[in-house]
């Protein structure tokens, strides 16, 4: 099958290449890729300034903003053939830091996490991919057209979560918010702010 791969550190290596078909292990889903998002991190990897290949490999399948349809699932569990899913990007440090040990591996303190399509694990940029059921998120079928935005939306949701955690240490009743930057993350942040009932303002630089 075909996949979008790169040699991390090599700015001229991005290519569609042939890779082996994935074989799901115990507790894994086999997924047909439907859509793949690209962001600034992917551009950095393609430029050769970021990214790490899996151990003993020189190429990495990129892509961490995923959307797919389940082709095969374990008999037991919540997933079924045809489900629309996205894959979680990060995996915790196998010798966990304090944050990883309590399940907050998005806040890993020692940097020994791995990430699909970024750091030492192939990403979701292939025709088919596998993912553990523990790192798959099932979406409502009505979100199929926008589901590829789930991963960047989680980045924004985490930012809001941290804002609320800090604010609620004392009296906290925000009325308005300023979002600096009108890229994908900034626009998603503005949308979530509006969803919270806030008066949202977005600031960006115009260079044209």
Where are the predicted features?
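Residues forming the Rossmann-fold NAD(P)(H) cofactor-binding site
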Residues: 187-188
């Amino acid at each position: 099958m075909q996949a979008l791969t790169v040699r991390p550190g090599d700015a001229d290596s991005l290519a569609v290449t042939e890779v082996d078909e994935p074989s799901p292990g115990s507790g894994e889903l086999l997924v047909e890729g439907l859509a793949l998002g690209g962001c600034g991190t992917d551009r950095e990897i393609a430029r050769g300034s970021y990214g790490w290949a899996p151990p003993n490999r020189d190429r990495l399948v990129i892509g961490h903003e995923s959307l797919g349809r389940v082709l095969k699932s374990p008999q037991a569990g919540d997933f079924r053939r045809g489900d629309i899913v996205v894959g979680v990007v990060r995996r915790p440090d196998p010798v966990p830091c304090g944050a990883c040990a309590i399940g907050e591996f998005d806040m890993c303190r020692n940097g020994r996490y791995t990430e699909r399509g970024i750091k030492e694990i192939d990403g979701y940029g292939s025709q088919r991919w596998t993912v553990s059921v523990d790192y798959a998120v099932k979406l409502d079928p009505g979100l199929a057209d926008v589901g590829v935005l789930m991963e960047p939306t989680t980045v924004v949701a985490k930012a809001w979560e941290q804002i609320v955690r800090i604010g609620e240490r004392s009296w906290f009743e925000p009325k308005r918010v300023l979002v600096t930057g009108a890229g994908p993350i900034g626009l998603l942040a503005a949308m979530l702010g509006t969803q919270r009932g806030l008066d949202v303002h977005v600031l960006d630089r115009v260079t044209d």
